[in-house]
């Protein structure tokens, strides 16, 4: 029997409310700043009451971009979406097929190949990123969607997760498929893929957010303003030296940048949670 402790309930709810407040208050301040004009946003202290310039600020960056030499913000949003979706689709496809081959095909040194993939997790990003940039430059893929997305499609983490899931699938499924005369790809498409849908949903959300939040890679690969992404664009709005940052425009751009990943999480919330729970069973 669980003992009822009112003080513990009050304490846990208080901590929950404080945690939510700590998370939401900066977002509220950003929203308020996005609704103010240039003068009001620099007032000390800045008001916490929303203003009336939100649509004006959004229209300004939507049409004129985030700086004197930048593409319109809608273009940056489109580039970020193409980048995130391409990375997600490619990462899931490559990782799933790699794990399928490692688990279900009996070929020499297959475990060695897996550990060669897995050991890349031990290398810091800083160690891998500059050789990757050199390869992309030699392949003439700078300033292109291919250079922006292809190097980020390989994932040791996703391959490991799919491998662990495939290993718990019963061998009877393979035997039944062989008796029915199914080819490996038929077995993959008709049996393995449907059983992996919850894991796919969880990985889709995580990978999309990972691709959407990329900052350093686009900064190294892209010099064409028409291929710029939102995260790098927002960083470019923050002035250095004696320049003045238009924080109302920065916060408006940040709010627009939040919308796509939030929509993805809300739409796939059930499948995302179910995928995380099922993967631990």
UniProtKB/Swiss-Prot annotation:
PANTHER family for the chain: ABC TRANSPORTER PERMEASE PROTEIN MG189-RELATED-RELATED, SN-GLYCEROL-3-PHOSPHATE TRANSPORT SYSTEM PERMEASE PROTEIN UGPE
Protein name: sn-glycerol-3-phosphate transport system permease protein UgpE
Location(s) in or outside the cell: Cell inner membrane
TM annotation in the entry: 16-36, 85-105, 113-133, 142-162, 202-222, 247-267
Main location as per UniProt: membrane
Chain ranges of the ABC transmembrane type-1 domain: 77-268
Keywords for this protein: Cell inner membrane, Cell membrane, Membrane, Transmembrane, Transmembrane helix, Transport
Keyword presence, Cell inner membrane: yes
InterPro entries xrefs: MetI-like, MetI-like_sf
Oligomeric form and interacting partners: The complex is composed of two ATP-binding proteins (UgpC), two transmembrane proteins (UgpA and UgpE) and a solute-binding protein (UgpB).
Gene3D superfamilies associated with the record: MetI-like
Membrane protein topology class: Multi-pass membrane protein
Any Gene Ontology CC annotation: plasma membrane
Pfam families given in the database record: BPD_transp_1
Function: Part of the ABC transporter complex UgpBAEC involved in sn-glycerol-3-phosphate (G3P) import. Probably responsible for the translocation of the substrate across the membrane.
Family: Belongs to the binding-protein-dependent transport system permease family. UgpAE subfamily.
Organism classification: Bacteria, Pseudomonadati, Pseudomonadota, Gammaproteobacteria, Enterobacterales
Biological process according to GO: transmembrane transport
């Amino acid at each position: 029997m669980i003992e009822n402790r009112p003080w513990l309930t009050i304490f846990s709810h208080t901590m929950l409310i404080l945690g939510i407040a700590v998370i939401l208050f900066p977002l509220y301040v950003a929203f308020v700043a996005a609704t103010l004009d240039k003068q009001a946003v620099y007032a000390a202290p800045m008001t916490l009451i929303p203003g009336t310039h939100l649509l004006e600020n959004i229209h300004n960056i939507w049409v004129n971009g985030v700086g004197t030499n930048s593409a319109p913000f809608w273009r940056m949003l489109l580039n970020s979406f193409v980048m995130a979706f391409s990375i997600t689709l490619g990462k899931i496809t490559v990782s799933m097929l790699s794990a399928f081959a490692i688990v279900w095909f009996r070929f020499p040194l297959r475990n060695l190949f897996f550990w060669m993939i897995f050991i890349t997790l031990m290398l810091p990003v800083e160690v891998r990123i500059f050789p990757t940039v050199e390869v992309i430059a030699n392949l003439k893929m700078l300033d292109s969607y291919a250079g922006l997305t292809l190097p980020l499609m390989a994932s040791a983490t996703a391959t490991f997760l799919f491998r662990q899931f495939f290993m718990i699938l019963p061998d009877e499924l393979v035997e039944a498929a062989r008796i029915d005369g199914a080819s490996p790809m038929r077995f993959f498409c008709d049996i393995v893929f449907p059983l992996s849908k919850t894991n796919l949903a969880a990985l889709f959300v995580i990978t999309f957010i990972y691709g959407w939040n990329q900052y350093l890679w686009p900064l190294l690969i892209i010099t064409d303003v028409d291929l710029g992404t939102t995260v790098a664009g927002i960083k470019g709005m923050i002035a250095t030296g004696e320049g003045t940052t238009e924080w109302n425009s920065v916060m408006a751009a940040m709010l627009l940048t939040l919308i796509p990943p939030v929509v993805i999480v809300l739409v796939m919330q059930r499948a995302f949670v179910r995928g995380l729970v099922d993967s631990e069973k």
